[in-house]
Amino acid sequence: MKENNKILQLIYVAWRERWTDSQWGINIKKVLPRGVSGDVYNLADCLMQQALIGSTANPLVLNYLKHSLCAHLVSHAAVIRCIAKYDKLERVYCITALLEFLASIVDGVTCRIKSEEAVLPSSVVHLVYWLLQIFARTVQHYELYGEISAEQSYMLDQTCVVIDRLSQQQFLLSMLYVGCHEELEICGRIRDKYATIKGSLTNSNFTLNAPQVEQQLQQLAFIEAKHLEMQPLNPPSTLEKISCCVQPLLAVEVLLNPCKDTSYYVAELQMLQRLKKYSNTRLFYEIIRAGFLTLSNVADTSPDTMWGAFMFFKMPHIIKQLHALQRIPGEQPPPADYIPELVEALELLIEDNLLLDFMDTKCSCNMIEFLLNDWTKQQLVNDVHVKKFASQREAASQLLKKCDNGQQTPSNINFIKRAEVPLSGVLKTLCTNKVQDMVNVLCQVPVGNSFELILSVATVEGRLKTFVSRLIQCNENSKPVPGDLGKLCVIRSTLFDVSFLMLTSIVQTYGSDVVLSERGDSFFEKWVRECMVERNKLKNPRQILALCDDSIVDELLLSFSKPEASQLKPNNLSWQETCLNLPGVLHHVLIAWEQETLSSADVKSILDNIKRRLFSFSVCATSFLCAYMYSVKETELLKPLNMIQQFLAPLTSEELSSQENAKERLALSYQIIRKMQHDVHPAPSTKSRLISHSPLVEQFREVWRTVVDAGHLPVRAAQSLESLLLAGGAAWLSTQLVEQLLACKYTRDMSRTMDVVFAVMHLDIEKTTEALLQYVVAPLILRRQGEDINEPQSLVLARLCVYCIISCLESRKGNGTSALTAMKKRSRSHDDEELAANAAKVRKVIGDGSDNSSDFTDTTTGAGLAALLGSTSTSELRTTPLTLREPLQTSVQHIFAVFLQFVSGDELSPKAVFVYQFISLLVECGGERVAPVLRLLPNGLVQQLLKVLVTDDIKVGLISRLYDLRIQAGRLSAVSDLCLWRNMQMARHSIHL
């Protein structure tokens, strides 16, 4: 209090003696202790009270206040707070003087010490409220009386000047943005006051001298992060004429996750849409183009049928869900019979004549018309659009047909749509108890490529699990019934055989994790878990043999070695028992052959007898032999290999005619046996994408050349890259991909390559992201700094890292249902749990589709999907976790620790630029979703970066988005960094107060 009294006395003396500013500065420093701010003794408050003691302001005392501010005796925060506390708004002259004072200092507002930083955001919020009070009071006076005085008009003009200056000062806007998270009550009052001003202006038709001020008031009242400047580094989608990201990403996802529900693909595409800033029209165009592009480059094999089924059965529902999720509440509902954005996308697609010509030639039809005729049933387009687009392609299609002259072999695409009806028929038949009907239907499925087509349709429609479960039930129901003789027994054996072979083929194609439940107790599920050899899932032959019953093995040995003698004895063995005990038979035969107890002719006879009984028996025998081959030396492989080859020996026409539908079942068993043998011991002459004697690097470069030449990611290339990932590991593949990225010479090529690399990393996004952040980026920058880790390479590399982090962060997770947990292509960490997300919108989309819509055709699948979608009403199918999961958290912490070392010096280097680009892109691309990542930023990283990066690239918008402003620690960190930025800017541009 002693110093306060001295200050007041000094003010009286100064005013009475009319001191100059310099005299005031000299004398006030004698009163204040050395090194102590005048804020401690309320110097600004004392001067303000004396300046505004009358009906008009005292200009001399206000000059003393300004001098104290320039001399850093008081802080801007304290002065602003004092002004905002002045509540005698009826004193027009005092208010006008304060407004003029504000206009003179507002461009230089900053903070010098920590204590000031804690006060400034709140002071700015109160100042804005004070300005709005003045504004509201004036316009309300005009509304009541129809006029205002010249003094009031001048005061309003000065208010507009201050508001204009405030709106143009990014630092003050950032302080306001931070302060609004602290002063929630005052922020609410500001918005109420703005509503009052807007109402008064509307009612009174008052014309402002500064027309832009109303928009500025709205900006101040509803301050958001988007109002704060930020240097954009992620290029806008308008610069990309054609995307190189959608097709590779879909190629990888359809390869890895063909069984995933529609919402999985929708979430993936939503993530990509946010990163690339695509409109719905652009996204729909890229999705359809990706489908055509991939189909144009695959042969009539499984990928062809899978992609064709994806286009016809999955893609319409993806587009439908994306459209529903993008709708804004309260927006005018779209037309019921078509999606406007899809029509616009088709108009873009119709211009791609080369692609459509190729597809028309490949499919021997007008592909656009063929596709859209189906989409009309799902109300994606209407008949008018079909006629319009079909007519635009008609002339070209007819010309292509004439040039073709009927020489083109029809593509599987023409038959995919027809496979839907047989699938429904098969599922319906499998629900019955009529054994003969089931045999008749199932034996027709393996004919030609029908089985492949039906599997493709079942996969993308989400009915694969239903198909498998009913096949398993059918296999269970085929057990021999006591008393069955003659034809009925043969029918049951045929039913067991064909269902077993079909199930085994499905497991080989998709993996047991995908199609079987973890604890299924059926015979087939037990046999797969304990006896079947799968790729990358070895079985111990000793454990398989431990399941055998010695008495049954002896009985089977007699039966297969001397079938004539065994026929005289009653045989009560079931087919299931035979399958489980065949390994014991094969083991005895193998040992006896090696010890020369049995001759080659005897072994051949036994193996032929096994195959003649049921073709599934030869599959069970081959599975054991493959497991056995894993456990022996290379010199001991010849005999088991010869035994497998004997199972592949053709049957005579008499043997085939002795069994009904034997030809189809035999062909399917050959296919299964060859695949088992190939996985264990591929033939040396076979050129396989899995087995090669050339170095991995050469294989990778060869695959990458095909990608570059094609301009997209062919399915075969995606399969080869998956094999290289399994062989070389995530770190190796990530390194090779980044090397290809940095080898590009031009920015356009670099961006395209980055898109493909980003998509390829989704072969295992979590492991490749971990490798990228922990083992690739830092060594690369340290080792090659100044060579090719510079602009624009560093920016593209930073963008790749950020894209991968965001994709990894948004990987779907949650409790998940057991059904969906099983729908995995292979063990990828983010597939272990499924996210319970979006509800009402997607449920509505699903509800008004046709009965063939993906993921909901079967009642059990529909229930599972409904449970998956949950009850939240959000437009996103992925939510951001509050904390990061491993290994992402450790990887991010590692790269941030490396960044801290990169900026620890005091020189600007490419390393520091990369750190800035990384952090800026993380904020720009991720928004609020990367909050868990930003929480891991080390203390001091941003401030050190500000000191090193002497350019003007860092803006307040970036700094304000780095911290969680809902908590005090986040606000303090943000203000500290903002004030450092402000002081450095002022020093750099030589701003004098």
From Swiss-Prot:
Component of the Mediator complex, which includes at least CDK8, MED4, MED6, MED11, MED14, MED17, MED18, MED20, MED21, MED22, MED27, MED28, MED30 and MED31. GO terms for molecular function: transcription coregulator activity. One of its GO terms (cellular component) is mediator complex. Transmembrane segments: none annotated. This is Mediator of RNA polymerase II transcription subunit 24. It is found in: Nucleus. Keywords: Activator, Nucleus, Phosphoprotein, Repeat, Transcription, Transcription regulation. One of its GO terms (biological process) is regulation of transcription by RNA polymerase II. Pfam families: Med24_N (PF11277). Belongs to the Mediator complex subunit 24 family. It comes from the Eukaryota. The modification Phosphoserine is found at residues 827, 829. Component of the Mediator complex, a coactivator involved in the regulated transcription of nearly all RNA polymerase II-dependent genes. Mediator functions as a bridge to convey information from gene-specific regulatory proteins to the basal RNA polymerase II transcription machinery. Mediator is recruited to promoters by direct interactions with regulatory proteins and serves as a scaffold for the assembly of a functional preinitiation complex with RNA polymerase II and the general transcription factors. Required for activated transcription of the MtnA, MtnB and MtnD genes. The keyword Nucleus applies.
